[in-house]
């Protein structure tokens, strides 16, 4: 028989200091630029190594405050599919977090099966870290070869 327990609410991290922040990214290098993610983490001041996880576990990690930031920057030509992100975005937002593209715009689900209007990548974090994360993305982008 199933064990009944009271549900526990989840909440994104309250971490405000990027040096103490933890970040996660996709395991798969085939469709994601881990080097660019490392550059963003460095520009943000994150000192920890990335937590590399599969699927929507990344969103769950941010929603539970196991990670403070999730970043994914797809390689040129790769199209993000909505089913890889939709449920995770809802979970992070319900936990008090923010999910946007790398330009700071909320994800647009109206383009069919792909996130056609995606600006460079996807980030998920707390409201406390989002603006600084956007600054780090911009700084990394201006010095990258992507």
Can you say where each PLM-predicted feature lies in the sequence?
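DPxDG-like acidic metal-binding loop motif
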Residues: 1-5
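An extended, acidic
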Residues: 9-146
